Structure formats: structure tokens, C-alpha cells
Amino acid sequence: MLTAEEKAAVTAFWGKVHVDEVGGEALGRLLVVYPWTQRFFESFGDLSTADAVMNNPKVKAHGKKVLDSFSNGMKHLDDLKGTFAALSELHCDKLHVDPENFKLLGNVLVVVLARHFGKEFTPVLQADFQKVVAGVANALAHRYH
């Protein structure tokens, strides 16, 4: 998946990420750009407009929770399937989330990182993070196979 150099680069960069801010924005953008994903968050209240979604405290809180789990995965890049096994089971068996949504969220996360970090988020880092989010999406979809 990742070389030792790529792991070092993404891990060092991830230390700069404010998961509360980035997580809320990434989940919010997912819900706005792919509105069918909102069906999993009906209990979150008003998701009727982009502003409502982006300012919804439950979206922000869940986005932080998602990125807290992602942060845990960043500590276990060599065992993403093991790290995300319980979440894969939850999302497959209980929540019935389409595993394609994990890929969508990963791609949105990369866009949000680029927005927050600008030129510091180099093309090389972007490529490395694309590998990470693909690995996480694959690990989360593992239970579906």
C-alpha cells in the first residue's frame, strides 16, 4: 500500500490536521454534494440546505468522530482491516451503509485537506493520501465481501 517514506509523510502531515474542523467540513460537504447520503443522518435535524448542513452541530460532531477513527487508522497503516473491523461490521450489518460512500467521503476528505492546507498539501501528499483513503474505504467495506 504505502512505502515507509509515504507513511512517514502522511503521518507527519496528519499531525497538523484539526480533526474537529476538517471532519465536520468533510462530512458536511459529503452530505451536500451527495445528498442521498443524508438518509443515514435523518436524526441530525435540518439538512435542507447547504448552509443548514454545514452549520449543523450534529454533522460537525459526527465529522469529528469519523476523523477520530481515521486518526486511529493513521496509527495503524499496516493493519487497516483489523483497525476498522468493528466499524466495518457496524456499517454493514446494522447501518446498511453502501460501501461506495466510504470512497466518496475519502475523496471529499482529500479535497478538504487541499482547501485547508493549500500549497503545503503537495501533489505528492495528495497522491499519498489518496492511497490512505482508498485503504480505509477498502477496510471499511471488508465486511461486505
Curated annotation (Swiss-Prot):
SUPFAM superfamilies: Globin-like (SSF46458). Keywords: Acetylation, Heme, Iron, Metal-binding, Oxygen transport, Phosphoprotein, S-nitrosylation, Transport. InterPro entries: Globin, Globin-like_sf, Globin/Proto, Hemoglobin_b, Hemoglobin_oxygen_transport. The modification S-nitrosocysteine is found at C92. Pfam families: Globin. The keyword Transport applies. GO terms for biological process: hydrogen peroxide catabolic process. The modification Phosphothreonine is found at T11. Heme b binds at H62, H91. The modification Phosphoserine is found at S43. Red blood cells. The modification N6-acetyllysine is found at K58, K81. GO terms for cellular component: blood microparticle; haptoglobin-hemoglobin complex; hemoglobin complex. Residues 1-145 form the Globin domain. The keyword Metal-binding applies. GO terms for molecular function: haptoglobin binding; heme binding; hemoglobin alpha binding; metal ion binding; organic acid binding; oxygen binding; oxygen carrier activity; peroxidase activity. Involved in oxygen transport from the lung to the various peripheral tissues. Belongs to the globin family. Heterotetramer of two alpha chains and two beta chains. This is Hemoglobin subunit beta. It comes from Bubalus bubalis.
